[in-house]
């Protein structure tokens, strides 16, 4: 079935909060960030992890991408802890689609800004700046990564 102005091979995708039952799949997606399974479990239970699901697959299929955020409610901020896309699906814009949806969810929860860190000139920095993140004027990180911020 093809809908108007939609490529028939582009799957229908849904951004949703990650379910604890899918913790192992989320940890696998975020393992290169690197976030270990213990940290992923903490982020899923106490902060926010969102996933991108392919609606053309069975409901038990693992998500195709995941993004984890540390939520700081008193400050009204979230920090992007990491984002991961299934290896065989990279380079198709899924990270951008996931982050765009995640940012809308965070805004709906009342958060006011999202912070992130990325290597200058790297793919992560390129992704973040393409969706509106800008350099944070604060001090540079000791590991050389740039601090970025996006007001919601």
Please describe what each predicted stretch is.
Residues 106-119:
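Conserved GNAT acetyl-CoA-binding A-motif
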Residues 129-138:
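Conserved acetyl-CoA-binding loop of GNAT-fold acetyltransferases
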Residues 91-104, 130:
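Conserved acetyl-CoA-binding loop-helix of GNAT-fold acetyltransferases
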Residues 47-49, 143-147:
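Short hydrophobic/aromatic beta-strand or adjacent loop that forms the aromatic wall/cage
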Residues 3-5, 13, 17-81, 86, ...:
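Acetyl-CoA-dependent GNAT
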Residues 116-125, 141-143:
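Conserved beta-strand-loop-alpha-helix junction that forms the acyl-donor binding cleft
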Residues 83-90, 118-119:
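A short, internal acetyl-CoA/4′-phosphopantetheine-binding micro-motif in the GNAT/acyltransferase core
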